[in-house]
Amino acid sequence: MPELPEVESVRRGLEPYVVGRSFAAVEVHHPRANRGQEAPLSALLVGRKIAAVARRGKFMWLEFADEDHSDPARDVLFIHLGMSGQVRIGEVDSPHVRIAAVLDDTTRLSFVDQRTFGYWRLGPWLSMAHIAPDPLETDFDLTAAGRRLRAKRTVVKAALLDQTVLSGVGNIYADEALWAVQISPLKKASALRQRDAVAVISAAADVMRAALAVGGTSFDALYVNVNGESGYFDRSLHVYGRGGQPCERCGEEILKTVLGGRGTHYCPSCQNRGVGRKSAAN
């Protein structure tokens, strides 16, 4: 699933094409791409002017010029990429185009989604108010986020993925952040010292900034930016996807386990803070 750097790459790519433009036509080619919307998407969007492309964590939306942007109940267009969603500029020759839109300057937007977990939905911004701030926001409160992380009774890896603690961190960047600060993903979040909780979140922010600088992480053709280009942060990963390979820091074999249904990669030797070595290897 696209994480913060991948979604932000799409947001930045989309912004110059759509801000100040209005929807001229919208066609939905698959019902799941507009699920939960009672009225036809074309009736809801045609004629509306786009004022901004916004994002929090993994969630992206379009703001409209005819809405009060300070009103939490304002309508926005949520564009959720799901597991494999892409927003592409121009016509795309693919059987997986789920939504096709045309703007008033003839710019075409294609929503391509092979696995159909993504969607476009018009609704109140308030519906995502429970999503926590993300570490790349300018006014992000690192101390408060550290306290939220320590308040969770799960292991720290699961707590990092909780979008009510901080948003935008997924499997890839959680593993990389924990490796960077040498903390085991199996350690209880509630057992972290405040300085360690802050260090983990700071590391997550650092690794996501580095990923964003190279367009995010692409393991296959399912994640590309608006121009169809892949990111290449996968070349810089230290632990994620490296199960069975030697740790770049200590040489120990990287382990892969499953936590909460998610594949988790870590070094049982140098990421041994907070759990015994025997527990870390199980």
Swiss-Prot record:
GO molecular function annotations of the record: 8-oxo-7,8-dihydroguanine DNA N-glycosylase activity; class I DNA-(apurinic or apyrimidinic site) endonuclease activity; damaged DNA binding; zinc ion binding
Q: Which SMART domains match?
A: Fapy_DNA_glyco (SM00898), H2TH (SM01232)
Any binding details for the cofactor? Binds 1 zinc ion per subunit.
GO biological processes: base-excision repair
Per the entry, which co-factors are needed?
A: Zn(2+)
Chain residues that bind DNA: 96, 115, 152
Please list every transmembrane segment annotated in the UniProt record, as residue ranges: none
Per UniProt, the keywords (alphabetical) are:
DNA damage, DNA repair, DNA-binding, Glycosidase, Hydrolase, Lyase, Metal-binding, Multifunctional enzyme, Zinc, Zinc-finger
Q: Where are the zinc fingers (FPG-type)?
A: 238-272
A single Pfam family, by name? Fapy_DNA_glyco
Annotated active site: 2 (schiff-base intermediate with dna), 3 (proton donor), 58 (proton donor), 262 (proton donor)
EC number from the UniProt entry? 3.2.2.23, 4.2.99.18
The protein's annotated catalytic reaction(s) are: Hydrolysis of DNA containing ring-opened 7-methylguanine residues, releasing 2,6-diamino-4-hydroxy-5-(N-methyl)formamidopyrimidine; 2'-deoxyribonucleotide-(2'-deoxyribose 5'-phosphate)-2'-deoxyribonucleotide-DNA = a 3'-end 2'-deoxyribonucleotide-(2,3-dehydro-2,3-deoxyribose 5'-phosphate)-DNA + a 5'-end 5'-phospho-2'-deoxyribonucleoside-DNA + H(+)
Q: Which InterPro entries match?
A: DNA_glyclase/AP_lyase_DNA-bd, DNA_glyclase_Znf_dom_DNA_BS, Formamido-pyr_DNA_Glyclase, FPG_cat, MutM-like_N-ter, Ribosomal_uS13-like_H2TH, Znf_DNA_glyclase/AP_lyase, Znf_FPG/IleRS
Its family remark reads: Belongs to the FPG family.
Instruction: Give the record's subunit note.
Output: Monomer.
Function per UniProt: Involved in base excision repair of DNA damaged by oxidation or by mutagenic agents. Acts as a DNA glycosylase that recognizes and removes damaged bases. Has a preference for oxidized purines, such as 7,8-dihydro-8-oxoguanine (8-oxoG). Has AP (apurinic/apyrimidinic) lyase activity and introduces nicks in the DNA strand. Cleaves the DNA backbone by beta-delta elimination to generate a single-strand break at the site of the removed base with both 3'- and 5'-phosphates.
NCBIfam families with a match to the protein in the record: fpg, PRK01103.1
Q: What is this protein called in UniProt? A: Formamidopyrimidine-DNA glycosylase
The top of its lineage is: Bacteria, Bacillati, Actinomycetota, Actinomycetes, Mycobacteriales
Q: Which gene encodes it?
A: mutM
